[in-house]
Amino acid sequence: MADGVSVSELVEKIRLDVFYGDELLEQKKVTVSDISRPGLELTNYFKFYPHERIQLFGETEISYAKDSMTKDERTKIYDRMADVDTPAFVVSRGLPIPEELIQAAKNNQVPILTSTLPTSRLLSNMTNFLEDRLAERDSIHGELLEIYGLGVLITGDSGIGKSETALDLIKRGHRLIADDRVDIYQQDEQTLIGEAPRILRHLLEIRGVGIIDVMNLFGASAVKNHTEISVIVHLQNWDKDAHFDRLGNGEQTRHFFELDIPKITIPVRVGRNLGDIIEAATMNFRAKNMGYDATKVFDRNLNELIKDNSQK
């Protein structure tokens, strides 16, 4: 997990306006992705107050404080909410900011940020950004491409031809996300995201050629910054004694964080066109996800044939 996201980065990415605390933005860190909307705190119940979270004020919170609380109550409550660990107060919808909230923020060095977005949309935008930035990360060796809209992670031993295969797939119109090193993180309970380290973004290394800039050579449509990893294609040197799945009914997976990602192992030997094979494997994987499994159709037809022959 990242050490924290500066409030300055949050302001830049979510396009927030700074009402107070420009000088505090770099030093204030957000360490959790959850956003708090004050509820019971406005009634002076602070037993479970999440002081380490961003505090988001929408129309409900601002209206309640204005209509149901006295000036002294607002001063007391807001001052308790402005904890030293609180990253920021955020006010949505361009709502007027209570004077007591401004004073509490100044007294306790808590930035005040504003946005014209509706509260629910602003909450979603901030949560999604923070979940991505604060997620646990890992790096793996391989190529990540988007093939027919699916994120395909190509793995295999060094020198087996992963980069050359990636180049072939790029020339066929597919997109490169990462070459050689892929940074991965779990976005949510069902999604694994892969991206390239910033210094390697859009670059591809080919032995004997060197490093090429894919975006400059093939255009912006040939690259993408990140994608969801849907399937792993593992390239393995051909071994006549090794067992390879011939029917496609053997399910393999590889575990990352809390997720098991489907895996397809492809034997590699001279004369096999890996670009064609990986395209076919990706299309077949997509077809299975849409409910059509060629292996099951073959099994059904075979069983029917055996049944018919046994009745003769």
From Swiss-Prot:
One Gene Ontology term from the biological process aspect of the record: regulation of carbohydrate metabolic process
Residues noted as binding Mg(2+) in the record, renumbered to the chain: 163, 205
Region (Important for the catalytic mechanism of both phosphorylation and dephosphorylation): 204-213
Reactions catalysed according to its record: [HPr protein]-L-serine + ATP = [HPr protein]-O-phospho-L-serine + ADP + H(+); [HPr protein]-O-phospho-L-serine + phosphate + H(+) = [HPr protein]-L-serine + diphosphate
Pfam family, one: Hpr_kinase_C
Domain of life per record: Bacteria
Binding residues annotated for ATP, in chain numbering: 156-163
Keywords, ordered alphabetically: ATP-binding, Carbohydrate metabolism, Kinase, Magnesium, Metal-binding, Multifunctional enzyme, Nucleotide-binding, Serine/threonine-protein kinase, Transferase
E.C. number: 2.7.11.-, 2.7.4.-
A molecular function (GO) term: ATP binding
SUPFAM superfamilies, per database record: HprK N-terminal domain-like (SSF75138), PEP carboxykinase-like (SSF53795)
Cofactor names: Mg(2+)
Region of interest: Important for the catalytic mechanism of dephosphorylation: 267-272
HAMAP family documented for this protein: HPr_kinase
Protein family according to the UniProt entry: Belongs to the HPrK/P family.
Subunit structure: Homohexamer.
Stated name of the protein: HPr kinase/phosphorylase
Organism: Pediococcus pentosaceus (strain ATCC 25745 / CCUG 21536 / LMG 10740 / 183-1w)
